[in-house]
Amino acid sequence: MAVYTDIHPNDLKVFLTRYAIGSLLSYQGIEEGIENSNFMLETTQGRFILTLYEKRISKDDLPFFCRLMQHLGQRGIPCPQPIIQNDGVMIGELAGRPAAIITFLEGEWIRQPDIDHCGEVGTGLAQLHLAGQDFTLSRKNTLSIMDWQVLWQRCQITEDALLKEFGQKIESELAFLQENWPFNLPTGIIHADLFNDNVFFVNHCLSGMIDFYFACNDFFSYDLAICLNAWCFEPDYSYNLIKARKLLENYQKIRPLIPLELDKIVLLARGASLRFLLTRLYDWFNTPPDSFVIKKNPWEYWHKLCFFSNVNSLSELGF
């Protein structure tokens, strides 16, 4: 979450008259994140989240995201629920941007997750994958392997010494992944961005999963590989086998991986590292300087990519 577009209080008050959520008491921009402009709303009926969808999010995809959250919520997945306007509309417009209000989830995201947090994530991810199997809408992953080359080319427009230093490794990794990427793994709805700032906990129990705006149809095991990247490294970039083992064990208690998924999981983890390295690089050089956003360190994913590139066995991942 983040703030790119500011809103005028009077415009917000008019916008809220379309909803049955009470009168506005206060609102505040939410700093975390990089995709959309988000605000915490406090009304006479409680707290809500207002999202203004910025240009990276296609307006045509918004019904998919909102319907998916409804679908998952109906199946017991703790995720935000869109608030419907009085006339039945789900997506409105505010400050020249598509806008929606969603429910507020209790809990906090964990900056230094422990083993139990990782286990909860493994369980929650598997439950999400199963809950999405009967979702009737679909969305292509617009940040999959076929999109990474274009993203890398856009990063190279910037004259940066580090990009030049590591460019050859990135290009060789792109070529390797494109040549070896699988196309026949179990597929369905994935979150595709289940980082620690998108998962809430209350007393070590997972209480919510948020930010479904990268959700799409792709390999379940790719989503799991993203979580290995996001949850199983320490601040010094060392891979924590105990955390990984707990995450993987809990996931497989609910949705066991088939042999072909196990065969490709290291490759998928390499791909996930490269995907987040490239998107963070792009955002690092292209985020407007006046935006209310904390940019994320792209080189964290350089270290993770190097780790996964040197993994030779499943036991090194935690299986």
UniProtKB/Swiss-Prot annotation:
Annotated NCBIfam families: PRK05231.1, thrB_alt
Entry EC number(s): 2.7.1.39
Gene Ontology terms describing biological process: threonine biosynthetic process
Pfam families named in the record: APH (PF01636)
Top-level taxon: Bacteria
Keyword Kinase: yes
Catalytic activity: L-homoserine + ATP = O-phospho-L-homoserine + ADP + H(+)
Family designation: Belongs to the pseudomonas-type ThrB family.
Entry keywords, A to Z: Amino-acid biosynthesis, ATP-binding, Kinase, Nucleotide-binding, Threonine biosynthesis, Transferase
GO MF, one annotated term: ATP binding
UniProt cross-references to InterPro entries, sorted A to Z: Aminoglycoside_PTrfase, Homoserine_kinase_II, Kinase-like_dom_sf, Pseudomonas-type_ThrB
Name of the protein: Homoserine kinase
Gene name as annotated: thrB
Known pathway: Amino-acid biosynthesis; L-threonine biosynthesis; L-threonine from L-aspartate: step 4/5
Organism: Bartonella tribocorum (strain CIP 105476 / IBS 506)
